[in-house]
Amino acid sequence: MVTDQGGGTSEADGGPVRHIPVLLKEVLAALDPAPGKIILDGTFGAGGYASAILDAGADVVALDRDPTAIAAGQSMMHASGGRLKLVHSRFSDLAEHAPAQGLDGVVLDIGVSSMQIDEAERGFSFQKKGPLDMRMSAAGVSAADVVNRAKVSDLIRIFGFLGEEKQAGRIARAIEKRRAETPFETTRDLANLIETVTPRKAKDKIHPATRVFQALRIFVNDELGELAHALFAAERALKPGGRLVVVTFHSLEDRIVKTFFQDRSGKAGGSRHLPLVTARAATFTPVGKPMVAASEEEASRNPRARSAKLRAGVRTEAPSPGADLSIFNLPELASLARLGG
């Protein structure tokens, strides 16, 4: 499933984007913040969750890999009376910023923030002309680097897996032909090409460029790898009884979170015909339902919530069995380092 992850209205809708914390009531219920607790918000963004957690009396350590978000949050930090700490960091490194006694909760809201989509110069939106960038931080490979340098076979895999784009081959070959004449520099350069190659049909609910832009953003920022590493980091950083709450917006992310909690449940079973058997001590037990979606009322008020899924678990006393990325069965894609030139 492909979705906008930017806030109040989707890119496909074409309306203004504003920040509305998704599933806020459900996130707070799963986290259970209270005075004396320390909660880590791994995706600070515009500070929606962090603000609500502070209001509930807990202290917050908030991370964001985007220096713009950290700068924008300074006023909130100063107003918190020392209860909010802001850190410029990837959330995959969250264990490095946890107190020695451990965390009482970790919340992750996966995806691009409304602030990033709003800024044309960040290059996240195909509806806003800007440099073809898409990096959540200033470092690393840009989307333009990928589009202009990646092999056609690599582009097909990136668009097909990360964007679930059925026309990946056609789009990749058109990119190869165009870049041989003129390199891609702006978001409109790429969006216009995609519109020409795969014109929008009356029945289409999303813009033809939606899936390719999603795929490039996920690839450039290694979002799936970051999420996988962050889940293992949270397992190490949470104290017994601490809670891990993750909100995702499309099937690739949700599959990773679901797989993680299943793997850490202490149960294993090969088919629906065989009973589950204990594999090892569980490191997480479920909080409420296995998956929580937004109510119809919230989805109508905030279109971003339509595809949101929340999964949560409580950390047990069992030791972490260690990080094993193979449980996620992620595909091997092109090397970001190689594409950087």
From Swiss-Prot:
GO terms for biological process: rRNA base methylation. The keyword rRNA processing applies. Its main location: cytoplasm. Residues 292-319 are annotated as: Disordered. Pfam families: Methyltransf_5. It is found in: Cytoplasm. GO terms for cellular component: cytoplasm. Keywords: Cytoplasm, Methyltransferase, rRNA processing, S-adenosyl-L-methionine, Transferase. GO terms for molecular function: rRNA (cytosine-N4-)-methyltransferase activity. Its EC number is 2.1.1.199. InterPro entries: RsmH, SAM-dep_MeTrfase_MraW_recog, SAM-dependent_MTases_sf. It is an enzyme of class 2 (transferase). It catalyses: cytidine(1402) in 16S rRNA + S-adenosyl-L-methionine = N(4)-methylcytidine(1402) in 16S rRNA + S-adenosyl-L-homocysteine + H(+). S-adenosyl-L-methionine binds at G47, G48, Y49, D64, F91, D109, Q116. SUPFAM superfamilies: Putative methyltransferase TM0872, insert domain, S-adenosyl-L-methionine-dependent methyltransferases. Belongs to the methyltransferase superfamily. RsmH family. Specifically methylates the N4 position of cytidine in position 1402 (C1402) of 16S rRNA. HAMAP family: 16SrRNA_methyltr_H. This is Ribosomal RNA small subunit methyltransferase H. The gene is rsmH.
